[in-house]
């Protein structure tokens, strides 16, 4: 039996829902799995590193503080996520290469699109608690 998000919300009233700030931008409209968290406001070095590692059906949840001056995900990094078995990517920030990412078999949710790539400063924090959209995300949830 397939459950929709409203069905899950009805069945588990204690479950919290993210405020409707993100858009579905990937080729897979629904996805699930344990999460890995990442905080990196304007540098996608760690996004690339994580998606180039084995995903085993996980979801990468990235807090970019909603920064709208650069994109943290492009087609090549998203393709690495598909190749390495990630179920999805959720970004409190922006992506680029929508025409390609929208065809990939991976869930992608983000605030929108921005064509400018991020700098590569190798900055970020993996596995830390992050909060956005009224939800706190913890690695392993």
Go through the PLM ranges and name each one.
Residues 1-138:
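Feature captures the catalytic cores and cofactor-binding loops of soluble hydro-lyases/lyases
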């Amino acid at each position: 039996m397939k459950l929709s998000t409203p069905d899950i919300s009805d069945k588990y009233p204690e479950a919290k829902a993210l405020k409707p700030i993100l858009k579905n931008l990937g080729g897979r409209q629904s996805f699930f799995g344990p999460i890995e968290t990442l905080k990196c406001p304007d540098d996608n070095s760690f996004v690339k590193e994580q998606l180039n590692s084995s995903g085993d059906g996980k979801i990468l949840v990235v807090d970019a503080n909603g920064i709208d001056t650069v994109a943290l995900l492009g087609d090549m990094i998203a393709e690495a996520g598909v190749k390495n078995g990630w179920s999805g990517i959720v970004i409190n920030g922006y992506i680029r290469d929508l025409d390609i990412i929208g065809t990939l078999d991976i869930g992608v949710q983000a605030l929108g699109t921005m064509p400018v790539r991020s700098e590569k400063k190798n900055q970020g924090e993996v596995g830390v608690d992050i909060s956005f959209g009224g939800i706190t995300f913890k690695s392993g949830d």
